[in-house]
Amino acid sequence: GSIRAGLGEIWNASNAAFALCWLLSAGQIHALDAAASDELRETYLTKLVSGEWTGTMNLTEPQAGSDLGLIRSKATPEGDHYRIQGQKIFISFGEHDLTDNIVHLVLARTPTAPEGVKGISLFLVPKFLVNDDGSLGERNDVRCVSIEHKMGIHASPTAVLAFGDGPGAIGYLIGEENRGLEYMFIMMNEARFGVGVQGLGVAERAYQQALANAKDRVQGKDATAPKGPSVPIIRHPDVRRMLMSMKSRVEAMRALAYVVAAMFDQAHRASDEAARNAAH
């Protein structure tokens, strides 16, 4: 909500790559809180909220990008869990050693699932399995097979993940079968807002750097003293106009972001049901 938006702007302005990590974790927390079983919430939410573990979102496959109906990853029932097999690409912070565990939310199909997006289910697949006492157990059958080469944000590891190169990665169903896309959209909607805040933070950083450069760079004469000494370029009217244009756009972005954040707060936390519904 509002606090997250303010902190998100600051984090993204200072390090947009690192901010992606907690953006995904925050979205996963909301998805698990809304749709996961009591047992899964008890096992995973505390560690995710504390930042001891981080979360990812696994949708895209080599043949399935914007058309998620083409997803081929499989989930085979086995007792109280499923065996996940498939490959996911473009997974932000899909592999790293910043935390002890990484919790993957993975879209996959069960054997009896209908075709298209109506047959997609959502599964929680931890990098390390969790023992009954909450300690970490053996490594799950999920591996990072490569890191994507990107034009920017290199400090954010964008992974290609292979699930089930061996016996199959152990995964736990979130909610009900064939409702995975519905649950994943809880996380995706959080991420969409977070990416908007990311743009705000980067824009604020760009303005601050442009302002600092305009104060430091000495070039040309002051228009009111053409025979005087050279001056910092912030003294030139057109440079000041460009800086004010940047600042006004950033302020407009900030206002929009904080209004939306306040609506998030109202939708989730207002004491009056009518107020909550009005914010949705």
Identify what each model region corresponds to.
Residues 56-78, 83-96, 276-280:
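Flexible, glycine/threonine-enriched loop-and-boundary segments that flank and lead into catalytic domains
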Residues 81, 85-139:
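A short core secondary-structure module
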Residues 111-114, 130-133, 151-153, 183, ...:
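N-terminal functional module detector in eukaryotic proteins
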Residues 63-66, 95-97, 114, 150-157:
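Short Gly/Pro-enriched turn/cap motifs at secondary-structure boundaries
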Residues 1-23, 27, 35-36, 40, ...:
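Alpha-helical interface subdomain recognition
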Residues 90, 129-145, 150, 157-191, ...:
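A glycine-rich, basic-preceded beta-loop-alpha segment at the flavin cofactor/substrate interface
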Residues 18, 28, 53-55, 69-73, ...:
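Structural beta-strand/beta-sheet cores of well-ordered domains, especially the beta-sheet scaffolds
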Residues 3-12, 16, 23-26, 34-38, ...:
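Glycine/proline-enriched, intrinsically flexible loops and inter-domain linkers
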